[in-house]
Amino acid sequence: MSSSRPVFRSRWLPYLLVAPQLIITVIFFIWPAGEALWYSLQSVDPFGFSSQFVGLDNFVTLFHDSYYLDAFWTTIKFSTFVTVSGLLVSLFFAALVEYIVRGSRFYQTLMLLPYAVAPAVAAVLWIFLFNPGRGLITHFLAEFGYDWNHAQNSGQAMFLVVFASVWKQISYNFLFFYAALQSIPRSLIEAAAIDGAGPIRRFFKIALPLIAPVSFFLLVVNLVYAFFDTFPVIDAATSGGPVQATTTLIYKIYREGFTGLDLASSAAQSVVLMFLVIVLTVVQFRYVEGKVRYQ
């Protein structure tokens, strides 16, 4: 089997074509990452005018800080809830629209609405609905004797930010899952039905394995979303409270850097978060992708 390679008249043309992307990557990714790594090894005054090299002291201080360790485990718990819940709920709705619900066009449009809402607005929307005194949902819960106050209950606060974050991401996941389900050849589904396989068995034995590549892609995307893009939700909904119950690493970095003006500690936390995401992504590609079959 022969393969052809593109031939350019100028040897500089390939480099010129990739130059814009390389410039963007260097300016907005590599350079900031390098700056964060450099500042994490320094002791910097609050205004950033002077610094002193301290090596790994900032990292040693971090991992002896109980508040930071709490934020670390809160991030793991929060990102797991958001990623798993977001994927399962989106897949459930995509399967409903594809196989069960009539008038799917209306439901497709309805499912896309959260994508048009900014994360902070999504948080404010659910704050109104879960308002302890006047919220519609809290009034409904009170009818069953359940007292809701996420400003004082850490479990309820975590549920609120997870719920708002998942709701915001449902549309994105739904689009990919629905497109993947539509791409499955109907002949496979019909053949399984003729053989006596029910809807549930057809879904788990045929549809789910065939959409595994899309599921893996969304797993990586949702994990990154949970680590970084949920900051506006947490900031608007709980501000990391109560008692830091919803303070994730990204929110603690913001507090340390912009409120506490501790640039060195904030940079060290950024480096730890960056390496954590890199490790999780590598693990996913190494062990999860190996079980995905691309057709």
UniProtKB/Swiss-Prot annotation:
Residues 1-11, 102-109, 178-207, 284-295 are cytoplasmic. The keyword Cell inner membrane applies. One of its GO terms (cellular component) is plasma membrane. It comes from the Bacteria. The chain crosses the membrane at residues 12-32, 81-101, 110-130, 157-177, 208-228, 263-283. It is found in: Cell inner membrane. It is a multi-pass membrane protein. Residues 76-284 form the ABC transmembrane type-1 domain. Keywords: Cell inner membrane, Cell membrane, Membrane, Transmembrane, Transmembrane helix, Transport. InterPro entries: MetI-like, MetI-like_sf, UgpAE/MalFG_permease. SUPFAM superfamilies: MetI-like. The keyword Transit peptide does not apply. PANTHER family: BLL4140 PROTEIN (PTHR43227), SN-GLYCEROL-3-PHOSPHATE TRANSPORT SYSTEM PERMEASE PROTEIN UGPA (PTHR43227:SF9). The complex is composed of two ATP-binding proteins (UgpC), two transmembrane proteins (UgpA and UgpE) and a solute-binding protein (UgpB). Part of the ABC transporter complex UgpBAEC involved in sn-glycerol-3-phosphate (G3P) import. Probably responsible for the translocation of the substrate across the membrane. Belongs to the binding-protein-dependent transport system permease family. UgpAE subfamily. This is sn-glycerol-3-phosphate transport system permease protein UgpA. The gene is ugpA.
